[in-house]
């Protein structure tokens, strides 16, 4: 018998039931009892093992992005950007890289409807020849806050009330009344695009500012954008109620059925670029995640296309155990000093270790598809077969060496240790500009959603006044309409 052939995989299933240790099970229907009506015996190991495994089938759900669906496919470079990055998977047009993508809602639980007004996660794992690259983003190009210090409080405010387990507007609007930088995100969330029709008809964005580095070591700030070839479609409230009332997993089913039918969803990848030498030339901070970069002066540059042409084989193994982290990058791509990105670099890996264990990157869906080597040994659920005698570095008995050095962004850091906000907040200009691009009918729906939210009986006059003041600073007519309908005088 080849001991390596039968490593755990369903392809090696025996024709009969066995225990976890491989012993044959001749009766998988009845417990072992004393006589036909007597007590069950503790020595019924098969029963105990079966129940114990069942009791442990569930793992902690993600604290955010719990509800999601995944699919596999490929990314293909269509345009040469080798002048901007030395990333191997972007080296030339025609290069294809396997990917797995997870779409998700953000705040609500694993079994919640996919028709709730909520941002959508859009996370892509590239299995490159130089290791994995995780581009972990959302469907909106901006975020609520710009500093990760606020992230736990933000999620607590958006999550259900800890006393009643009910999501309530007064908690959300109380928290964000302290954070006017959230206005831009709300012009997306409370807009008509706040409920995507499904995952196929949805934009994607890397949200944070990253850096691209070319072979010469020249670095550029970069933003990543996914555009669906089938267009963006959304649900208005009435449609969401109808669709969600019929099938609370409609987006998951749409993705699965479309791929199964050969109707493969496709997205084009675009980037925006800023030379760090020019970062002070704008009226916003390029590292501020609450801002978009204006496309009229920073145009979208095409890079490639992503096609999802294969459904996952097992939901638990390739969706629940699928783990993303913005820290997972490859040569030619690096982090910027975006405050939210810097905190995500730690937090995502940390939550995966809590949820899946310290060896979560050994799980097949998370493991790199290229050769890899390190001395990270042992720990809970370490199932990698290793026969080395040397588990340290350096050693004259193990010829492993350092990889060839690759360019990283040049950076000179100086300054005082301090906790402070960025200088260019500019919280109101962009939300106002975006609101003014809406048609009158779309503006009216946006206003009505805010009327509904601010009409929560637990929202105080002070909080209503703050929000009307914020929206008045973004657009005077918007603030006036809200104030009139809520019978509140704006105070700027």
Swiss-Prot record:
Changing residue 421 to V: In strain: cv. Landsberg erecta. Pfam families: Catalase, Catalase-rel. SMART domains: Catalase. Catalyzes the degradation of hydrogen peroxide (H(2)O(2)) generated by peroxisomal oxidases to water and oxygen, thereby protecting cells from the toxic effects of hydrogen peroxide. Keywords: Cytoplasm, Heme, Hydrogen peroxide, Iron, Metal-binding, Oxidoreductase, Peroxidase, Peroxisome. The lineage of its organism: Eukaryota, Viridiplantae, Streptophyta, Embryophyta, Tracheophyta. It comes from Arabidopsis thaliana. Heme binds at residue 348. PANTHER family: CATALASE (PTHR11465), CATALASE-2 (PTHR11465:SF23). The gene is CAT2. The active site is at residues 65, 138. This is Catalase-2. Coiled coil: none annotated. GO terms for biological process: cell death; cell redox homeostasis; cellular response to nitrogen starvation; cellular response to phosphate starvation; cellular response to sulfate starvation; hydrogen peroxide catabolic process; photoperiodism; response to cold.
